Amino acid sequence: FSREQCLEFARGSLAKVLGPEFTVVDSYPARVRLPDEPLMLVDRILSVEGPMGSLSSGRIVTEHDVLPDAWYLDGGRCPISIAIEAGQADLFLCSYLGIDQAVRGRRTYRLLDAAVTFHGRLPRPGDVVRYDIRIDRFVRQGETYLFFFQFDGTINGEPVLSMRNGCAGFFTAEEIEHS
């Protein structure tokens, strides 16, 4: 998927990106989206694996280009928070795997927990950071869905950061307000 398709996923129609089986999702009052600019940090989606709409495990591989004029650079480096946020395509993957059809626009995404480890230097201009993101499983308790995920970020095949024990869920506005 191209950057333009990622931006369409963020701003526009899910069906235009993933196909007509997702048309109903475009009518929901809320759905999972990648962030729009300036926080769109997915420049390409190289591959997506897993049965579409299955609420099962899956994998997505993305890349983020660290450009010389990137708004977020600090001292010629990508800040820790941006390096982590650039692994944001778990959003695309959970939608592809069917969470929007399950929650029907009544619940929204919240990251609950994760453990991040840095293995090397922070990304610099000219680097391309590849994120290999895996959703291990979805669980449901009543109407609440959670999923568990992890990712590895590399530059030229060298480990830069990893996230383990990632957990995100889908909650109503009332549940979020009272949490």
Region spans (language model):
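Catalytic strand-loop segment that frames the active site of acyl-thioester-processing enzymes
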Residues: 1-4, 15-24, 28-32, 36-79
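HotDog/MaoC-like acyl-thioester-processing domains
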Residues: 1-12, 43, 53-56, 61, ...
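Hydrophobic beta-strand-centered segment that forms part of the acyl-chain substrate-binding groove
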Residues: 5, 13-27, 33, 38-39, ...
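Active-site helix/loop of acyl-thioester processing domains in fatty-acid/polyketide metabolism
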Residues: 45, 68-69, 78-106
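Residue-level marker of positions within ordered structural domains that often coincide
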Residues: 50, 67, 92, 138, ...
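Short Lys/Arg-rich amphipathic alpha-helical segments
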Residues: 69-73, 104-106, 121, 156
